[in-house]
Regions:
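Sec-dependent signal peptide recognition
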Residues: 2-9
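N-terminal signal peptide c-region/cleavage motif recognized by signal peptidases
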Residues: 13-15
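Short glycine/proline- and aromatic-enriched beta-strand/turn motifs that initiate or cap beta-hairpins
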Residues: 18-65, 118, 182-205
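Structural motif
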Residues: 27, 111-113, 154
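Short acidic, glycine/proline-rich loop/turn micro-motifs
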Residues: 40-45, 83-86, 124-129, 167-171
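Predominantly the C-terminal beta-signal and adjacent terminal strand-loop region
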Residues: 41, 48, 74-77, 141, ...
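Gram-negative (and chloroplast) outer-membrane scaffold detector with strong preference
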Residues: 60-130, 136-137, 149, 184-191
Length: 205
């Protein structure tokens, strides 16, 4: 009898363990934060002054495929700079990424996830000798935390590490690091949960 009662309790609680977002949700994620970009061999070669911290932003359009798997397309934007004044080398990066993540742990109001992805970085380099394009492939891994704020809004904290480099300075033998760490926080909008009144259902469902 006790076993049957416990089973009934677990079945009744199952929808509450869905995590954030829930299965079948479409998602829009807005994130902003700081990039830590090591200057590496390029900075050692040129001796250019370089700050470690720079702003970074992400916009994600995704879909919760099942209770644990979430994927989508992300658009990223970041800034970087080497040197000062008229001779500075300024970098603007626009990234197009395919991303997939899976839940490591989840409850009724949160999801801890790990993910990764691949994409392309469109890098515009501004320098005294003239602007140039130095595009590059990019790959990343991530670890994050999503938590419920309201029925269709959640918070997100994410740390990711990207690998990417580009020949941004023709006068140097080493490439410029376009990757590094990105720590962001923001919000996720999720909609069309199976429990929502407006969610599409099968005929007769």
């Amino acid at each position: 009898m006790r076993l049957r009662t416990a089973a009934c309790v677990l079945l009744a609680a199952a929808p509450a363990l869905a995590g954030v977002p829930g299965k079948g949700d479409g998602t829009i994620t807005l994130l902003g934060g700081l990039r830590a970009i090591p200057g590496g061999e390029y900075q050692s070669e040129t001796g250019a002054k370089h700050g470690l911290w720079h702003p970074g932003f992400l916009l994600g359009l995704g879909f919760q495929l099942d209770d644990e798997l979430h994927g989508g397309i992300q658009l990223g934007y970041g800034l970087d700079q080497y040197g000062e004044g008229a001779g500075a080398l300024k970098i603007r990066s626009f990234q197009i990424l395919l991303e997939l993540d899976t839940a490591l742990a989840q409850g009724s109001w949160y999801t801890v996830y790990a993910g990764g992805g691949l994409g392309y970085s469109l890098n515009t380099i501004s320098r005294a000798a003239g602007d140039l394009e130095a595009n590059s492939a990019v790959g990343f891994v991530s670890l994050g935390f999503r938590f419920r704020i309201s029925d269709h809004v959640g918070g997100v904290i994410e740390e990711r590490y990207s690998i990417s480099s580009a020949a941004a300075d023709p006068s140097a033998t080493n490439t410029v690091n376009m990757g590094g760490n990105l720590l962001t926080a923001g919000i996720i909008f999720h909609f069309f949960s199976p429990q929502d009144k407006g969610h599409p259902t099968a005929p007769g469902g």
